[in-house]
């Protein structure tokens, strides 16, 4: 697999479109950090790291609105790919839906959202957009 982050986001998108409650994906340190951010920002209900074998898995419980049955994640898009990396400075930080969504960045200080990176005045690689 050439792009594990794109695979992770695609598995989440497919589970959302199929109205699954839980999706299980192979684990990596970068996927764990992205999952933590999605949980902190309220896009997923819960997550659990399962150490089964050398790699382990991440079980992600998707968040649905009980009244409308709509998922909290409306849009997931991979921005930087292995073939075409996208970097941004803190002054040129992308605004997702005029600040309503988040951009997840990989910086020298770790994986964080666009707002956290702008506060620390550091740029990085734009991994994905979520809203």
Model-derived features: where do they sit?
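Core subunits and conserved enzymes of cellular information-processing
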Residues: 1-131
């Amino acid at each position: 697999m050439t792009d594990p982050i794109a695979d992770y986001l695609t598995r989440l998108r497919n589970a959302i479109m199929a109205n699954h409650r839980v999706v299980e994906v192979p684990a990596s340190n970068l996927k764990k950090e992205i999952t933590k951010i999605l949980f902190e920002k309220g896009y997923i209900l819960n997550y659990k790291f399962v150490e089964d074998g050398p790699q382990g898995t991440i079980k992600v419980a998707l968040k649905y609105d009980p009244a409308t049955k709509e998922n909290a994640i409306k849009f997931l898009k991979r921005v930087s790919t292995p073939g075409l990396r996208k970097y941004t400075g803190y002054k040129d930080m992308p605004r997702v839906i005029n600040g309503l969504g988040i951009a997840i960045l990989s910086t020298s200080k770790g994986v964080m959202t666009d707002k956290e990176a702008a506060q620390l005045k550091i740029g990085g690689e734009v991994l994905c957009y979520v809203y």
